[in-house]
Amino acid sequence: MKYRLGDARVETHPDSWIAPSAAVIGKVRLDAGASVWFGAVLRGDNELIHIGEHSNVQDGSVMHTDMGYPLTLGKGVTVGHNAMLHGCSVGDYSLVGINAVILNGAKIGKYCIIGANALIPEGKEIPDGSLVMGSPGKVVRELSEPQKKMLEASAAHYVHNARRYARDLVEDPA
């Protein structure tokens, strides 16, 4: 569900999709093929939250900003279930694992995997092509080319799945 907050309106591309139980509020922009899944909350009450083309925010994830810390997902980003992102940027074709936390001012490069339950502290910069694990998150190695292709496939799968849900999801009161 989209909500206006004062003059701040959610901007959606016609090819984006928001699940009925998601809450997308205020200064939020979804590009073509972007999707926000069930129970996710994107609260753009301070700064812009920009969800790039073909990016997906999965079930239960929370995104928020502080003044001076907008939140940006590049192209083809996958944000796993129950992740929490706050005032950060995530580069193209990166994956944020289940329950991962990324804090204000952190910058995740392109083609990165932030492992499940990882914590990326404020202001931390992660180089392109990194696998990050732990709390606090540490680069454990570089991704292989097949792993990078898997990140592209993950994003493409969610674009296809969102289109299927937009077309076929019907409330069933029975």
UniProtKB/Swiss-Prot annotation:
Pfam family, one: Hexapep
Protein origin, superkingdom: Bacteria
Listed transmembrane segments: none
InterPro entries for the chain: Hexapep, LbH_gamma_CA-like, Transf_Hexapept/Carb_Anhydrase, Trimer_LpxA-like_sf
Homology family: Belongs to the gamma-class carbonic anhydrase family.
Protein name: Uncharacterized protein PA3753
Taxonomic source organism: Pseudomonas aeruginosa (strain ATCC 15692 / DSM 22644 / CIP 104116 / JCM 14847 / LMG 12228 / 1C / PRS 101 / PAO1)
